[in-house]
């Protein structure tokens, strides 16, 4: 079988040889992240909930993975009195927040990071509820709400992907 002398076919053949010879193609503009890190915060306790370690063995790394993007971080808030099965509570300390803040990319949102409302919507901010008496445990819920609110202000920039 004879090859055509057409330059387009020659360049196509040459590029396929280059690909199979081990040269890596140039990076795609958006590479997929290699991992997805998820943080869960229980709104009822104001604590971070860590997921139990996975029992699945780690994936073997391939020799040629091409372009690799850093992991994507996601923060998930949930409400309730019970924690998920197989989870362990870890309190949100200021040190943990500072460590997470060091890994953040610069803020690229439309508004300023401090553009959160000064207070979260709730019965303590409702003008109708101002005259009513607080139920037992309301102070504890308010304290938990404040912890979560301050934690969220510190983690405002984590809505996107770490670059």
From Swiss-Prot:
Origin superkingdom: Eukaryota
Assigned GO CC terms: cytoplasm; nucleus
Biased composition (Polar residues): 17-26
Biased composition (Basic and acidic residues): 1-16
Region named Disordered: 1-30, 96-149
Disulfide cross-links: none
Listed Pfam families: C1ORF64
Cross-referenced InterPro entries: C1ORF64
GO terms (BP aspect): positive regulation of intracellular estrogen receptor signaling pathway
Subunit note: Interacts with 14-3-3 proteins.
PANTHER family, per database record: STEROID RECEPTOR-ASSOCIATED AND REGULATED PROTEIN
Cited function: May regulate the transcriptional function of androgen and estrogen receptors.
Protein name, as recorded: Steroid receptor-associated and regulated protein
Record organism: Mus musculus (Mouse)
